[in-house]
Regions:
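Thiol-based oxidoreductase modules, predominantly thioredoxin-like and allied folds used
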Residues: 266-283, 295-307
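Short, internal strand/loop/helix patches
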Residues: 287-325
Length: 368
């Protein structure tokens, strides 16, 4: 799926009603139903404004991953009915132990280095896990161990994720992350206490400050501002997000039901979307899809193009590192804390720690 030199396997399931689920480890990621268009089978991947388009040949399909407006073809894709495995197992090979938590260092093609934490779980030859970075995690990866080599992949509708590596004699691991736009090398060492820097300290200097005044349109065309009566004397959570962002999906899946349970406590949410196009019609389309998917009941507004300069300019932030970034605004309208990045449910105990810290911060602000 990444061209002639590398095929990245993934699994999907179509139920009797035509609903499609992308399968990665324990996750069943629901897409839109199959559409028959002329002689093609189309699987809309609305979350990323993409689609899989296939021609059907007996039990196999061939086609492409492309944008829904047909502006570009991203990758060629083939599919075969009935194959439930991801990576084919080789007979008479023993799987080395890979399971564990690792301190990881990624090296980019530019030479830049980035810290990470890998969380890997193993059952025989079957391997699942994720890589955490300060910007977010790689979500649910699934794969296999063959001898001292391991392979992991993931696909939920954007570009596929692929990691391959090996266990060395000293117990360390080395490998590569390969994508349509990235090719990074990594090395790692087991460390059950491995952790990233505190995400609440990445952008906080300890001083509470006002955001730049903003007035942005919601999905109905209404202008929303933090100074609106609705938000006065309330704790307001402001996620900086995008419908195209996989980690933002995990944040919305948490925030939507959380808001339903906590909105009567004096807390509100304004999600600010920065999207891949500045066209209002496009932004409204993808934001409505996002809203419907997660049953969002709080305000969503469109902030502009998805780049760091736009975020900093529209909100008056001195620095911006990653999507999502979440602002905690106190009852006086000051930014009390900023959480950079996101560690989602695929990260296990790191996600549990995030949930505790999030709720503790909200509880503290509500008591002020």
């Amino acid at each position: 799926m990444l061209g002639e030199n590398l095929s990245v396997p993934f699994n999907f399931e179509i139920d009797p009603k035509g609903m499609v689920y992308l399968l990665n480890a324990e996750e069943r990621f629901k897409t839109s139903p199959v559409v028959l268009r002329n002689d093609s089978v189309v699987i809309p991947l609305d979350q990323f404004d993409n689609e899989l388009v296939f021609l059907f040949h007996n039990n196999t399909m061939s086609g492409e991953l492309r944008k829904q407006d047909h502006r570009s073809t991203l990758l060629p894709v083939t599919a075969e009915k009935g194959k439930t495995y991801r990576f084919a197992e080789k007979k008479n090979t023993k799987a080395e132990k890979v399971e564990g938590v690792y301190d990881i260092e990624f090296t980019f093609e530019s030479g830049k280095k980035e810290r990470s934490v890998a969380v890997l779980k193993q059952n025989g030859k079957q391997l699942t896990g994720t890589f955490l970075k300060e910007s977010g995690d790689s979500r649910y990866l699934q794969g296999i161990v063959e001898g001292n080599k391991f392979y992991l992949s993931s696909f939920i509708g954007s570009t596929p994720g692929y990691y391959t590596g090996e266990v060395n004699n000293d117990g360390t691991i080395t490998g590569e992350q390969i994508g349509s736009r990235v090719h990074h090398h990594f090395k790692g060492k087991r460390n059950s206490f491995a952790a990233l820097p505190d995400p609440y300290k990445a952008l906080n200097d300890g001083e509470r400050k006002k955001l730049a005044p903003f007035a942005m349109p919601d999905v109905h065309g209404n202008i929303v501002s933090l100074s609106d009566e609705k938000y006065k004397n309330k704790v307001v959570i402001i996620p900086i997000t995008g419908t195209w962002c996989p980690n933002c999906i995990d944040e919305a899946a948490f925030l939507s039901p959380w808001y339903q349970k906590n909105k009567d406590r004096g807390v509100e949410i304004i999600t600010i979307h920065y999207e891949r196009q500045t066209d209002t019609a496009f932004a409204n389309k993808v934001m409505r899809r996002f809203r419907n998917r997660f049953d969002i009941q709080y305000d969503q507004v469109f902030g502009g193009m998805a780049n760091s300069d736009t975020v900093r300019r529209t909100l008056g932030l001195p620095e911006f590192k990653s999507y999502p970034t979440t602002l905690f605004v106190d009852k006086k309208g000051n930014v009390a804390k900023i959480h950079s990045g996101y560690s989602g449910p695929a990260t296990g105990r790191f996600y549990d720690e995030f949930l505790k810290d999030f709720n503790d911060e909200v509880d503290k602000l509500l008591k002020e």
